[in-house]
């Protein structure tokens, strides 16, 4: 690579490091140079040093990272958070509150249409009105029961089929 290309690549790596680590550009450059411009190595070094309060006094001491997505929460803290959660039993026991009634009841304009069909009657599927021949293989809906279809809709369907 030419000198300009290397400088450009290094500048881009420094900028990416600053964005990823949230440190100053000069610190990013020092870490990247120390890691021979290996981005992951420099990033690991940065986060290991930032988690060790006195890294130059005790270089052999390693601390567990505490603020990373892969680190589980502190176990006692997690237990305390779970103990604050409530179950739905608390909602049922306090059903006199208006919020509990709203949460457990259907809305006032709720229409249970699915419960209106007769027990042995299955509502047929109505095919889409797109230009295909699928509707020729399906029976036409017969809801409500006992209602007969007039000749006009069948003539319209025949006319539509003739145009295809």
Curated annotation (Swiss-Prot):
InterPro entries: UBA-like_sf (IPR009060), UBA_8 (IPR054109), UBALD1/2 (IPR039310). The keyword Acetylation applies. SUPFAM superfamilies: UBA-like (SSF46934). This is UBA-like domain-containing protein 2. The modification N-acetylserine is found at residue 2. Coiled coil: none annotated. Pfam families: UBA_8. Keywords: Acetylation. Belongs to the UBALD family. PANTHER family: UBA-LIKE DOMAIN-CONTAINING PROTEIN 2. The keyword GTP-binding does not apply. Transmembrane segments: none annotated. Residues 144-164 are annotated as: Disordered. It comes from the Eukaryota.
């Amino acid at each position: 690579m030419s000198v300009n290309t290397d400088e450009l690549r290094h500048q881009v790596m420094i900028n990416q490091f600053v964005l990823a680590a949230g440190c100053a550009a000069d610190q990013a450059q020092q870490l990247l140079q120390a890691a021979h411009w290996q981005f992951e190595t420099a990033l690991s070094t940065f986060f290991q040093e930032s988690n060790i309060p006195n890294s130059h006094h005790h270089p052999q001491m390693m601390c567990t990272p505490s603020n990373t997505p892969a680190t589980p929460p502190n176990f006692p803290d997690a237990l305390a958070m779970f103990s604050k959660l409530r179950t739905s039993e608390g909602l049922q026991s306090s059903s006199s509150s208006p919020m509990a009634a709203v949460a457990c009841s259907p809305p006032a304009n709720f229409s249970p249409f699915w419960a209106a069909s007769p027990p042995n009657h299955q509502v047929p599927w109505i095919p889409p009105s797109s230009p295909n021949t699928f509707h020729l293989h399906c029976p036409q809906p017969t809801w409500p029961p006992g209602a007969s279809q007039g000749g006009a809709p069948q003539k319209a369907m025949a006319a539509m089929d003739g145009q295809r």
